[in-house]
Regions:
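Alpha-carbonic anhydrase
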Residues: 2-291
């Protein structure tokens, strides 16, 4: 179980700063605007571990439960490097984009809530969707779900492999983005949509460059303006050792593009219409908004 040490919790549920000199003196405007009352911030620096009775994910991200905090900037490296090779495959439960074994370069992530925990290596992106465009995301944002939710899974490099990292409380981080469905196609996503029929059956795959396969969401990642909280994997084995990093501002895709994901076949050889887990109890864990 992941542990984020709680500095101190006041009776109103807000976070008290260890060092008042480290507290924010004002709340800068962010986009999209967050209409919630500011909480006392945590000190600057990466987040240490926290322990709670249950840290299952996904959750409903309520702005009223969040504390605005200055954290070190997130640093994404080599995500679209030409040396990164990606395998897009139908796992029977989702579309997954794995870094190929022969990839010369492997993207990394550091900073933010991970600053005290080292460098995290990108392992895969996988996608969640639902039967309807308003039911596709796993996390809710102020009780609202989106059409698509993407999870970029990273593992702490001190554990060498994803499988080993899953055994440790500081082993994993998942960067999350959302997509809202409308009438207009997302041109960056269209190449992938055109390839989905070639992996309609489970355990089929195609090889791509990182730019062809990951560019459709790369603009979402910023050094700040994200939520972070301690949670779990949303698929088996549901280990509670994930630093979640969630960008609330959605990108846009078309309903037609979302439907293309639903047309993929599951392990049971039926259309995979939904693969999103239900929201789990919040359990008063820390919820941070990085500014």
């Amino acid at each position: 179980m992941i542990r984020w040490v709680v500095y101190s919790l006041c009776s109103a549920g807000c976070f008290a700063a260890i060092n008042p000199n480290d507290a924010l003196s004002g709340w800068p405007e962010v986009h999209p605007p967050l209409n919630f009352k500011p909480k006392l911030p945590l000190p600057r620096g990466g987040l240490p571990p926290f322990h709670a009775p249950a840290l299952q994910s996904p959750i409903d991200i309520r702005f009223s439960s969040a504390a605005k905090v200055i954290l070190p900037p997130l640093e994404f490296e080599d995500l679209l490097n030409d040396g990164v090779r990606i395998i897009m495959r139908n796992t029977g439960t989702t579309v997954q984009f794995d870094v190929a074994d022969n990839s010369v370069v492997r993207p990394t992530l550091m900073g933010g809530p991970l600053a005290r925990h080292g460098v995290f290596q990108f392992s895969n992106l996988h996608v969640h969707w639902g039967t309807q465009d308003v039911l596709g995301g796993e996390h809710k944002v102020n009780s609202r779900r989106f059409a698509v939710e993407g999870h970029c899974v990273h593992f702490n490099t001190k554990y060498k492999t994803l499988e080993e990292a899953e055994k440790h409380e500081d082993g994993l981080s998942v960067v999350t983005f959302f997509a809202k469905a409308g009438n207009v196609d997302n041109p960056k996503l269209e190449r992938l949509i055109s390839l989905l029929p070639s992996i309609r059956y489970p355990n089929t795959s195609v090889s791509l460059t990182a730019r062809d396969s990951l560019d459709w969401f790369a603009d979402i990642g910023e050094p700040t303006n994200y939520f972070t909280y301690p949670g779990s994997l949303t698929t088996a084995p549901f280990t509670e050792n994930v630093f979640w990093i969630i960008y609330p501002r959605p990108m846009f895709v078309s309903s037609r593009q979302v439907e293309a994901f639903r047309n993929l076949l599951s392990n049971e050889l039926v259309e995979n219409r939904v693969n999103a887990r239900t929201v789990q109890p919040f359990n008063d864990r820390p919820l941070i908004y990085s500014v």
